[in-house]
């Protein structure tokens, strides 16, 4: 594998993670706004005094972890267990919480995760061949439903 191909796969994987982050942030915003429409309660964590949506203080984001064969697309969530008085709590900060997808470093194939360590069999998408369909799926269903057959 050439360096150009490796960088291309990693660049597309980064773009894929950015799309997931963007789509998920929009989904979370719509859920909160629709909740206000239903019950009229505006939580001070997400809305200012004027009723405008402000977003989250430590919103989750998606990135990838480089492995031997795959790039692992993971959700990073803010954890601060020490604030709840837990003994031996991990320091506050972002930690990987769930695997969203696996991306083959050589071919650019996108796989559904079977577990934290391994992908399911059968590629769902290819970052090079049908990138537009993949990104459209991300924008419509940011939690990974587009990866199921």
Model-identified regions with their sequence ranges:
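Exposed beta-strand-loop-beta-strand "reactive/processing" segments of non-cytosolic proteins
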Residues: 55-101
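A short, surface-exposed interaction/processing loop segment used at functional sites
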Residues: 107-136
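Intrinsically disordered, low-complexity segments enriched in small/polar residues
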Residues: 33, 38, 53, 120, ...
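C-terminal partner/receptor-binding element of secreted or periplasmic proteins
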Residues: 129-149
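Negatively charged, low-complexity tracts enriched in Asp/Glu with abundant Ser/Thr
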Residues: 2-68, 75-76
């Amino acid at each position: 594998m050439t360096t150009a191909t490796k960088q291309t796969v990693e660049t597309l994987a980064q773009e894929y993670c950015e799309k997931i982050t963007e789509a998920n942030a929009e989904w979370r915003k719509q859920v909160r706004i629709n909740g206000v429409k239903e019950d009229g309660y505006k939580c001070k964590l997400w809305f200012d005094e004027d009723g405008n949506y402000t977003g989250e203080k430590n919103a989750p984001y998606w990135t990838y972890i480089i492995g031997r064969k795959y790039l692992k697309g993971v959700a990073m969530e803010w954890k601060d267990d020490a604030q709840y008085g837990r003994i031996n709590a991990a320091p506050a900060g972002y930690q990987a919480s769930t695997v969203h997808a696996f991306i083959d470093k050589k071919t650019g194939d996108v796989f559904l995760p079977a577990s934290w360590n391994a992908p399911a069999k059968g590629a769902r998408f290819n970052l090079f061949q049908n990138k537009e369909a993949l990104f459209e799926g991300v924008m419509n269903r940011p939690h990974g439903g587009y990866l199921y057959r």
